[in-house]
Amino acid sequence: MTEMFKERLADVIRRPLITEKATKGLDINQYTFEVDHRAAKPDIKAAVEKLFDVKVIGISTMNPPRRSRRVGRFSGKRAQVKKAIVRLAEGNSIQLFPDSES
């Protein structure tokens, strides 16, 4: 684990990604998260295991390129985003959606 995230593992994971492709991965126990772009795989594994109390068996990460944005005559870049696909051990799961009681 890197020194940067040793104190605050909660800063590693920003939010879960809920897309059509990520939702299909839930059937095979894969969860997709947006993570800090400086986080390494051991940081992500430690954060998921501690925050959600599950056993992680594999992590795939990807750094898509930053996209350009333009507002009027001003151009810039969107924030750097890193995605992590986390595979959990059999029998473990993460509750992403609250139970509806209606």
Swiss-Prot record:
Q: Which organism is it from?
A: Prochlorococcus marinus (strain SARG / CCMP1375 / SS120)
Q: What name does the UniProt record give this protein?
A: Large ribosomal subunit protein uL23
**Is Iron given among the entry's keywords?**
no
User: What is the role of the protein in this entry?
Assistant: One of the early assembly proteins it binds 23S rRNA. One of the proteins that surrounds the polypeptide exit tunnel on the outside of the ribosome. Forms the main docking site for trigger factor binding to the ribosome.
The record's keywords, sorted A to Z, are: Ribonucleoprotein, Ribosomal protein, RNA-binding, rRNA-binding
Taken from the record, one Pfam family name reads Ribosomal_L23
Span-the-membrane segments of this chain are none
Q: How does it assemble?
A: Part of the 50S ribosomal subunit. Contacts protein L29, and trigger factor when it is bound to the ribosome.
Biological process terms from the Gene Ontology for this record are: translation
**Per its UniProt record, what SUPFAM superfamilies does this chain match?**
Ribosomal proteins S24e, L23 and L15e
Recorded GO MF terms: rRNA binding; structural constituent of ribosome
